[in-house]
């Protein structure tokens, strides 16, 4: 499932784990802090994975696009 992930870049936060994950799944950078990701993870597993990659209090959102072009939007509480 394609997902658009976006977050606020905060000075002092380390995003290396996120960038490594994006590279591993061959994510596509759209803007400084927005990426297109294609993953087979369920919504729940995707959110869990993303939570593990960010620092507390980061603002993270994603949009999922199904193969039928249905959209799903959610804020991930970190």
PLM feature segments, named:
Residues 1-30, 34-43:
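Extended, hydrophobic alpha-helical segments
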Residues 47-78:
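Charged interaction segments
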């Amino acid at each position: 499932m394609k997902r658009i992930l976006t977050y606020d870049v905060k000075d002092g936060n380390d995003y290396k784990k996120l960038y490594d994950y994006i590279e591993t799944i061959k994510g596509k950078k759209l803007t400084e802090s927005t990426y297109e990701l294609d993953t087979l993870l369920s919504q729940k597993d995707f959110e869990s994975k993303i939570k593990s990659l960010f620092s507390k209090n980061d603002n993270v959102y994603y949009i999922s696009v199904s193969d039928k072009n249905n959209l799903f939007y959610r804020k991930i509480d970190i």
